[in-house]
């Protein structure tokens, strides 16, 4: 963003949102290809020789607006040396530059909305990290959760209409509309696939931007209600949630929606409401009754359809009771369970046994899916019995031990936020014995012989980083270190498991 300031007149761009003239500037394409702005992309890479010149951009846009553009390119590719077979390359570069342009108004508003706020200056935080404080909230006091599949736009014109609130440049919107409708492979740019969304590998930057702007509008109702009621803001998740972009739009939506929602706001003033978005779905947990959650369900459907023309159905929102439902987030299974407890009370000569049930929210390691993944990777059979890894038999002994140990350490690191880590001992057993069987197969020996000769060394490789730190910090207080290790620890570098830690 600092590089933009050297080339853009920020006051004029921020006031009028005119970005179309910038598409003819060479440095926009340098930014799109991560080139430095101090050099010309023409001199730095001969592959981009004269591709982003003003003349090419003008001719390409003019040619794109012709109805017979695709036919013309197919029939005249050999006779037109200026465009020729590279027309798709020019279109690709033009679209990449356009993706940078449409992000400018959003980036400027985000910077202005964050001024004066105490926010952690970290580039590693993402909106997905708001799941961690979401799982640390007081879920044991909540009753219901709405499992919402984010509505997707059936018609691409909805995406263009969404950007009209931010980009006032009509020419830019026309060009975006042409990009979306001209090329066949972009007609289904956002397609729902199970619970998530898939994007084309080409031009992923623009596709992700359009999808995020779409979700930004979808989540606007939560911004408004959160601003109206101080209870909607979770103290523990405030730092993370402030980094999610749609909270930068609070002032705008208050001005737009205040008059429309005064009559029905009383329905939704819930002192215990928690919201998070994960992939293609979002979760709304509340202490409210079943009737209140049903009101939320049908109100959200009507709100999306009437105000944003986003087609949705009540069947895409599932209401579940937390005591009978498990949340599947980031590979964890989270649920509220009842811990029975009996208290003995004595009054004078009479004693009473009082049964009490205490709610507790647990994040559990999904052991069965993990064993299934290990089985597919040929570390064990479907029942979880360890087997050897023949394809690794050609490696050295140290490499074999290191690979097995790294897989377990990464899995342990990923599931460090679990409240019950006992399941990881089974994974540790499978990988440790699988490593021993692989070594025994390589040296044509027995497993017992290798465990006897390399037992301590093999066991040390499976120590996790947390266990090593605690053992060094508390060498004599093993109980203290184990107690600390049992606590849930969330690491910000956790995004996804990469095929069993890229074995």
From Swiss-Prot:
Principal localisation: plastid
Disulfide bond among keywords: no
InterPro entries: Domain_X (IPR024937), Maturase_MatK (IPR002866), Maturase_MatK_N (IPR024942)
Coiled-coil regions, chain positions: none
Subcellular location, record wording: Plastid, Chloroplast
Pfam family, one: MatK_N
Gene Ontology biological process terms, A to Z: mRNA processing; RNA splicing; tRNA processing
GO cellular component: chloroplast
GO molecular function: RNA binding
Keyword tags: Chloroplast, mRNA processing, Plastid, RNA-binding, tRNA processing
UniProt xrefs under HAMAP family: MatK
Family per similarity comment: Belongs to the intron maturase 2 family. MatK subfamily.
Function, in words: Usually encoded in the trnK tRNA gene intron. Probably assists in splicing its own and other chloroplast group II introns.
Record's protein name: Maturase K
Organism: Diospyros kaki
């Amino acid at each position: 963003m600092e590089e933009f300031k050297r080339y853009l007149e920020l006051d004029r761009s921020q006031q009028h949102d005119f970005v179309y003239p910038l598409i003819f500037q060479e440095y926009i394409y340098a930014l799109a290809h991560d080139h430095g702005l101090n050099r010309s992309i023409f001199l730095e890479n001969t592959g981009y020789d004269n591709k982003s010149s003003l003349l090419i951009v003008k001719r390409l846009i003019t040619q794109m607006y012709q109805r017979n553009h695709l036919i013309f390119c197919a029939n005249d590719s050999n006779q037109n040396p200026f465009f020729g077979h590279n027309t798709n390359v020019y279109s690709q570069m033009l679209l990449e530059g356009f993706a940078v342009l449409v992000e400018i108004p959003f980036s400027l508003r985000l910077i202005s909305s964050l001024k004066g706020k105490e926010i952690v200056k970290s580039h590693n935080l993402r909106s997905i990290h708001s799941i961690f404080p979401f799982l640390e909230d007081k879920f044991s006091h909540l009753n219901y959760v709405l499992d919402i599949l984010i509505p997707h736009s059936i018609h691409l014109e909805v995406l263009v209409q969404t950007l009209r609130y931010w980009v006032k440049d009509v020419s830019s919107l026309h060009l975006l509309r042409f990009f979306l409708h001209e090329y066949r492979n972009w007609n289904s740019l956002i397609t729902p696939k199970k619970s998530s969304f898939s994007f084309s590998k080409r031009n992923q930057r623009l596709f992700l931007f359009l999808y995020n702007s779409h979700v930004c509008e979808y989540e606007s109702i939560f911004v408004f209600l959160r601003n109206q009621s101080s209870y909607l803001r979770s103290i523990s998740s405030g730092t993370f949630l402030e980094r999610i972009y749609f909270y930068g739009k609070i002032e705008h939506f208050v001005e737009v929606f205040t008059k429309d929602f005064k009559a029905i706001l009383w329905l939704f003033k819930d002192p215990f409401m928690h919201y998070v978005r994960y992939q293609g779905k979002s979760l709304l947990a509340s202490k409210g009754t079943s009737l209140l959650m049903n009101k939320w369900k049908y109100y959200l459907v009507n709100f999306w359809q009437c105000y944003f023309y986003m087609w949705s159905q009540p069947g895409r929102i599932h209401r579940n009771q937390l005591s009978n439902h498990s949340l599947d987030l980031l590979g964890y299974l989270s649920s509220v369970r009842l811990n029975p407890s009996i208290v003995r009370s004595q009054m004078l000569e009479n004693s009473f046994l009082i049964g009490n049930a205490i709610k507790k929210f647990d994040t559990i390691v999904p052991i069965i899916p993990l064993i299934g993944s290990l089985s597919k990777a040929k570390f064990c059979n479907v029942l979880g019995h360890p087997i050897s890894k023949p394809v690794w038999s050609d490696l050295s002994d140290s490499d074999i031990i290191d690979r097995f140990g790294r897989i377990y350490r990464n899995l342990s690191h990923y599931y460090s936020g679990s409240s019950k880590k006992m399941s990881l001992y089974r994974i540790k057993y499978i990988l440790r014995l699988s490593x021993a069987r692989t070594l025994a197969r390589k040296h044509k020996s027995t497993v017992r012989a290798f465990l006897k000769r390399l037992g301590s060394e093999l066991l040390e490789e499976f120590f996790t980083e947390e266990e090593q730190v605690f053992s060094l910090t508390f060498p004599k207080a093993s109980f203290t270190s184990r107690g600390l290790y049992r606590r849930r620890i969330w690491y910000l570098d956790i995004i996804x498991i990469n095929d069993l830690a890229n074995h």
